[in-house]
Amino acid sequence: MAVTAAQVKELREKTGAGIMDAKRALVETDGNMEAAAELLREKGIAKAAKKADRVAAEGLTGIAVNGNVAALVELNSETDFVAKNDQFVALVKETAELLAASKPANNEEALAIKTASGVTLEQELVQATATIGEKITFRRFVVIEKTDAQHFGAYQHNGGKIGVISVIEGADETLAKQVSMHIAAMNPTVLSADELDSEFVKAELAQMNHKIDEDNASRVLVNKPELPHHEYGSKSQLTEEVLAAAKASFEEELKAEGKPEKIWDKILPGKMAKFIVDNTKVDQQFALLAQLYIMDDSKTVEAFLESKGAKAIAFTRFEVGEGIEKAETDFAAEVEAAKAGL
């Protein structure tokens, strides 16, 4: 039977299929709109299944705030080109809004959420895989709740490649967003240094000192003084005994320099503060509150917030593709393979 342009247009609007796919489906189903739509869905699932073993490591983060609930999600695509596709961008936005509204507990519950079109989120992702032409993956999400006295800091960087939600108490949304900007830039992994495992601290400290050794090897070649190792890496290692020993050492230095004892109390606090900064480098790398605030690096994030009567409660930071092993592609080999398949 003859298929009209109006029928093709209607089917495309309903399914998102391409012109030729829509026309073929209508021809195969004798113009039955519902049957054609079902046929396209079936073909879409089949196409999506073929793409299931591809690595999807590009994509976007999405953020949605719904009153005292916020959601952060990461959807992946295979290429950065598709990540900028309007349909993909809209899908990420819709997914974040659904998560904030439904507050699912895990990925299984999230994928079972009904979308505005009546299908589940999982089905919508399958359809998107078919129509966009790349594997679309729902990777991870978090739902964060706050009280009326707290504020969300929602921030996305680099077009959504990094997404951050923070919860700040005793501040306003502007300050909360600034903290999230800091988190996006400095990539802390925990809120407080108290959350860092002692073995982790030891391993990271060893890695830092190894890097110093490498730097010193280069410095020697150009007659620069060698940098000292960090003896400690976290405030958890700075016991009362360690701090007392450091203070005693500084007192000996001041005495040897001939500094009058009556002015020591003015000098020692600065030396002790520097000692703590120099020996909490692991904390500063991984713990938000211990990091120097990027908008005022004379203070840690914790000290800056305290100066504003505020307190950081929680945060989550997603960076697209982190932890996903990307396949190495050989463009020339792909071209030859494509030629062979012609």
From Swiss-Prot:
Pfam family, one: EF_TS
Family note: Belongs to the EF-Ts family.
Annotated transmembrane regions: none
Primary subcellular site in the record, as a coarse category: cytoplasm
Localization per Swiss-Prot or TrEMBL: Cytoplasm
The entry's keywords: Cytoplasm, Elongation factor, Protein biosynthesis
InterPro entries in UniProt: EF-Ts_dimer_sf (IPR036402), Transl_elong_EFTs/EF1B (IPR001816), Transl_elong_EFTs/EF1B_dimer (IPR014039), Transl_elong_Ts_CS (IPR018101), UBA-like_sf (IPR009060)
Protein name: Elongation factor Ts
Functional description taken from the UniProt entry: Associates with the EF-Tu.GDP complex and induces the exchange of GDP to GTP. It remains bound to the aminoacyl-tRNA.EF-Tu.GTP complex up to the GTP hydrolysis stage on the ribosome.
Keyword Glycosyltransferase: no
UniProt GO MF annotations: translation elongation factor activity
Domain of life (superkingdom): Bacteria
HAMAP family named among the record's database cross-references: EF_Ts
Coiled-coil region(s): none
Region of interest called Involved in Mg(2+) ion dislocation from EF-Tu, as start-end residue ranges on this chain: 79-82
Cellular compartments per GO CC: cytoplasm
